[in-house]
Amino acid sequence: MAKEKYDRSKPHVNIGTIGHVDHGKTTLTAAITTVLARRLPSAVNQPKDYASIDAAPEERERGITINTAHVEYETAKRHYAHIDAPGHADYVKNMITGAAQMDGAILVVASTDGPMPQTREHILLSRQVGVKHLIVFMNKVDLVDDEELLELVEMEIRDLLSEYDFPGDDLPVIQGSALKALEGDSKYEDIIMELMDTVDEYIPEPERDTDKPLLLPVEDVFSITGRGTVASGRIDRGIVKVNDEIEIVGIKEEIQKAVVTGVEMFRKQLDEGLAGDNVGVLLRGIQRDEIERGQVIAKPGSINPHTKFKGEVYILTKEEGGRHTPFFNNYRPQFYFRTTDVTGSIELPAGTEMVMPGDNVTIDVELIHPIAVEQGTTFSIREGGRTVGSGMVTEIEA
């Protein structure tokens, strides 16, 4: 019998497992793929065992090595891409670099332990990098005889989530055992199916990139005699059409306005360019020296130039090619946003004297030129052209 072909009509959602080491994230990932393969067999739903997920391949994202396992599966309603990272450092890097863009996550907490230090850290990181929807899976309930103890652990988790501005009282908490489900215990398999129903219902469908406001980072600029100035780059999000009014934002204090008079891709004229396309846009009324690499072309009013922001950053270790020594307050590296480097100074949090290679920390940054940034914009920190850190804007300050 022919395998059914990949069904693009199902909404696609990115999720992941987060939580403290050894609380069962990878076992749960294996259980989800295995139970779905048993209950909803399809070409997509293939069982993955613990070992294959745990042997996550190394990837490089903006100069940083990260181990990440990607599995896919589907429910009756949706297609999921699921990210699981084996080590704690891999999670931190994944989230801060934006390598793992999760629409929602399953927070795994062992009922035998309750919340632990990394549970807290992963909740904080989720809050910082904009993962808005968490579902709790209390794992290993088969090892706890005392019903009251389970209630206490659940209360503790809910309080912790509320502390970081998640709706701790209202978000779903599912109690089960990933290992028992993996072993084929039907009671615990049912709970995995209940978990997936909850993920279907509770984590909203993400807004498609093409529905977001236009953002096109300018990579190159040239002029075509008799026609005007062309800016080229890859459309980050949104759509650009001929006759659109746009704004040119960043590097300079003032925002310039222009009208798109042509869109082309691979030297062919288009009516519109979509998120992901590499395009050249012809701009009316803009001189060759009025637009430069590092600026962005954006939907009017959608993004502004800023010089001050808070960021959550990960600093590379020496082994990853980063610094060999710590840095201190007023460290002045380059911040690489999309297509350009801008010098900026770093202010450390009160009470933090220095930042060591391998640390993650919240910093205040002040750039020497304004750049088009918003909450969620990612950046690299560089010194003399080599990457020494990676970060994400968590709050705009000026």
From Swiss-Prot:
Its main location: cytoplasm. CDD domains: EF_Tu (cd01884), EFTU_II (cd03697), EFTU_III (cd03707). It is an enzyme of class 3 (hydrolase). GO terms for molecular function: GTP binding; GTPase activity; translation elongation factor activity. Its EC number is 3.6.5.3. It catalyses: GTP + H2O = GDP + phosphate + H(+). Residues 19-26 are annotated as: G1. Residues 10-207 form the tr-type G domain. Residues 139-142 are annotated as: G4. Residues 177-179 are annotated as: G5. Keywords: Cytoplasm, Elongation factor, GTP-binding, Hydrolase, Magnesium, Metal-binding, Nucleotide-binding, Protein biosynthesis. SUPFAM superfamilies: EF-Tu/eEF-1alpha/eIF2-gamma C-terminal domain, P-loop containing nucleoside triphosphate hydrolases, Translation proteins. Mg(2+) binds at residue 26. It comes from the Bacteria. Residues 84-87 are annotated as: G3. GTP binds at residues 19-26, 84-88, 139-142. GO terms for cellular component: cytosol. It holds the Pfam family GTP_EFTU_D2. Residues 63-67 are annotated as: G2. PROSITE patterns: G_TR_1 (PS00301), G_TR_2 (PS51722). It is found in: Cytoplasm. Coiled coil: none annotated. GTP hydrolase that promotes the GTP-dependent binding of aminoacyl-tRNA to the A-site of ribosomes during protein biosynthesis. Monomer. Belongs to the TRAFAC class translation factor GTPase superfamily. Classic translation factor GTPase family. EF-Tu/EF-1A subfamily. This is Elongation factor Tu.
